[in-house]
């Protein structure tokens, strides 16, 4: 961990050694989004958490990655080869794993992480968030999922989830799969306290997803 301000503000170590953060390759039009990415990065460092992210060096991705790396934590970026010229500007941040497609990217990020957080972002960020929620519902993983609702950015999405529950498309227990909060500190505290309440559709070992380690030879690396 880094010294100085980070060390002075240290808190108890998180039970999550590594957290995957989904976020935009754009910074957004308002400073509040960039500030939130920086704050989350500092909070991960304070709690002794390493970062897995989408591998870009621009937008919110670049901000949080540089913050965590500068704080002395490990940063691993996972990026499809086709997006390297688009999402990496100048030097990459931390370690970079190049994959073939978006599915492999998400699976590799999930395999390497103990929890997931979504910062504001566009279609890609929302799709990644929803896939991790769906995988949890199906029983593919049981890792906490957090939504950092910066300045109400995700209020319409949360309202849609509430509508889905009210109309009978989302089970009430599945509505509790993820937690949300307006600040990084509050969100991570909620995630530390998260307990699964929903009934999984099928156990993780019944899913043949080699990228996540299911169906692999026993003893294979699943760090």
Swiss-Prot record:
Keywords for this protein: Cytokinin biosynthesis, Hydrolase
Organism in which the protein naturally occurs: Oryza sativa subsp. japonica (Rice)
SUPFAM superfamilies assigned: MCP/YpsA-like
Family of this protein: Belongs to the LOG family.
Binding residue positions for substrate: 87, 105-106, 122-128, 134
GO annotation, cellular component aspect: cytosol; nucleus
Protein task: Cytokinin-activating enzyme working in the direct activation pathway. Phosphoribohydrolase that converts inactive cytokinin nucleotides to the biologically active free-base forms.
Gene Ontology molecular functions: cytokinin riboside 5'-monophosphate phosphoribohydrolase activity
Swiss-Prot/TrEMBL catalytic activity: N(6)-(dimethylallyl)adenosine 5'-phosphate + H2O = N(6)-dimethylallyladenine + D-ribose 5-phosphate; 9-ribosyl-trans-zeatin 5'-phosphate + H2O = trans-zeatin + D-ribose 5-phosphate
Domain of life: Eukaryota
Recorded name of the encoding gene: LOGL7
EC number: 3.2.2.n1
Expressing tissues: Expressed in roots, leaves, stems, tiller buds, shoot apex, immature inflorescences and flowers.
Stored InterPro entries: LOG (IPR005269), LOG_fam (IPR031100)
Pfam families, alphabetized: Lysine_decarbox
GO biological process entries: cytokinin biosynthetic process
Protein name, UniProt field: Probable cytokinin riboside 5'-monophosphate phosphoribohydrolase LOGL7
